[in-house]
Amino acid sequence: ATHLTKFPNEYDSNIISCCVIERKRESDGCTYTKRVAAVRNVLPSLLRKVETLQVEHFELEEECWWNTKLRKLMVKSHNLSVSNWITMREASVFTPHQHNPNWTHFEQEGTVTVHGLGKLGYLIEVFSKRFLSAGAQHAITITEKLMAERQTRITSVWYSEFLFA
């Protein structure tokens, strides 16, 4: 589950920190993890007209359910900060692809709603949609890089132990 260990990393400077708040094994065998992340405020200054949006970072809460038997990861996240103005929600599911279990089938949906800011709210929604869509693709690329690095480390450790055993 590279997803649960990938942030922060050197590939995405917008993730400032990520702290595990809770981790437990549920009765169905799933591992439940709740994290809070601090993410850089990427809103352009033009869209930061409201005082509560003039912050360095936002906090997001993420909940994950990892079923190792089914190889299924479900992720739900929402914003904790500025929630009186903006509601951001995202849900993702990672499962083995039906035609090749070595591939991952990835589904994601999300919403951004801005409350009570009129045309400024509409501009924030449009910006957020574009930024988050690009961010989802960027997150996939980061995950692939981290998985490749992890595989290289595992292979090199195994190989060096084999040579020097």
Predicted region positions:
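Eukaryotic helix-linker segments that join adjacent hydrophobic helices
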Residues: 34-51, 55-56, 60-63
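Terminal "cap-and-tail" regions of soluble proteins that handle hydrophobic small molecules
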Residues: 11-12, 23-27, 48-56, 66-165
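Hydrophobic ligand-binding cavity/cleft-lining segments
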Residues: 1-43
